[in-house]
Amino acid sequence: MDLQLPRGTRDILPEEVSKWHFLESAFNKVCENYQYEEIRTPIFEHTELFERGVGDSTDIVSKEMYTFLDKGGRSLTLRPEGTASVVRAFVEHKLYGEVSQPIKMYYNEPMFRYERPQGGRQRQFTQMGIEALGSDDPSIDVEVISLAMEFFRKIGLTNIKLVINSLGDKESRLKHREALVAHFEPHIDEFCAECQVRLHKNPLRILDCKKDHDNPLIQSAPSILDFLNEESVAYFENVKKYLTALEIPFEIDPTMVRGLDYYNHTTFEIMSVEEGFGAKTTLCGGGRYHGLVKEFGGPDTPGIGFGIGVERILLALEKAEINIPETKPLEVYVITAQPEAELKAVTLVNKLRQNGISAEKDYLKRKLKAQLKDANRKKAIYTVILGEEELQTGNYQLKNMETGEQEAVSETTIIEKLTNTKEEK
């Protein structure tokens, strides 16, 4: 019997959770400042949702999904990405009928893909993301990008670069598609079997192929930017203009198509340029989509969003040697100098906690010296020592563990002192 972790998963142990809380808190605050509201969707959906939404020519749908039949014979899939589920919820709950548009949502949820596990990439991973539905104004494209850049600034990741592209509207993409087929078809036997299937199904996917990315034919492929019609050019120019106005530097990569079929117009990636982490490690990716809501049975509604892999961000922070703040410190450790003080320790710890003060005590009946060591290990700011004299007088020894200062004070004074200290901070 194998009782170890399944390959591609990991436990997040208590000493690591503070890092996750730090990222989650930073992301939530940035999203709320931009007026995005949280949405939570099911871990599994009907398989067809991802086949139609993500695209059956993508690696995600063709090779990476965790799909199973339930007891009723229905095909279900653990969600591999966030956008399809959010758009499904938008349609199912008729959020397109809301007076206040666009509808702006964020999520932070586990995703599942059957991939080869490696640094920053697991089979169960956590993705933070946002979706803005209901506006086709290029300024909201820039808002979405700006939000992502602000999140990275907030957590201290500044050694990054923004890369953008435009896939244009439907007309522009059809012309580009024809040019790609004409370019690749005479040499398609030089490509992998998957790319040969993609040629007439979705030739854009060839540009995104992991196996053939070094093939010179990909580098010499027709650029989408040469096929943008007047409307698409104007849209992309506005995106660039707004980014420049916000002083957000960017590069343009006409080969960047992203790994999903639903994108049009603006696509973007934010990459790490941290030495030793990989010059092209993508930390965030997203783009605009105009047909997804209609594909799911709703009205023709534009949208834009992005996804950020939390595990990859944690790895980037580690490589950049950025220290993540620790969790809320232990404020008081109550120490019992004799067994008779145990009852008072229990009630004092409880009262401190009820007053919003983090408190801890010994539960192993250790000696005074061992309790002090435990308080040090837990990085307690103060200790309260309960001995025979303290029980008789009702004044307890409150010790500042950093300065070593110690004073005899009442229970009420301890609570007032620590509460005032918290308010001053």
UniProtKB/Swiss-Prot annotation:
Its main location: cytoplasm. One of its GO terms (biological process) is histidyl-tRNA aminoacylation. It catalyses: tRNA(His) + L-histidine + ATP = L-histidyl-tRNA(His) + AMP + diphosphate + H(+). It is found in: Cytoplasm. Its EC number is 6.1.1.21. One of its GO terms (molecular function) is transferase activity. It comes from the Bacteria. PROSITE patterns: AA_TRNA_LIGASE_II. One of its GO terms (cellular component) is cytoplasm. InterPro entries: aa-tRNA-synth_II, aa-tRNA-synth_II/BPL/LPL, Anticodon-bd, Anticodon-bd_dom_sf, His-tRNA-ligase, HisRS-like_core, HisRS/HisZ, HisRS_anticodon. Pfam families: HGTP_anticodon, tRNA-synt_His. It is an enzyme of class 6 (ligase). Keywords: Aminoacyl-tRNA synthetase, ATP-binding, Cytoplasm, Ligase, Nucleotide-binding, Protein biosynthesis. NCBIfam families: hisS. Homodimer. Belongs to the class-II aminoacyl-tRNA synthetase family. This is Histidine--tRNA ligase. It comes from Listeria innocua serovar 6a (strain ATCC BAA-680 / CLIP 11262). The gene is hisS.
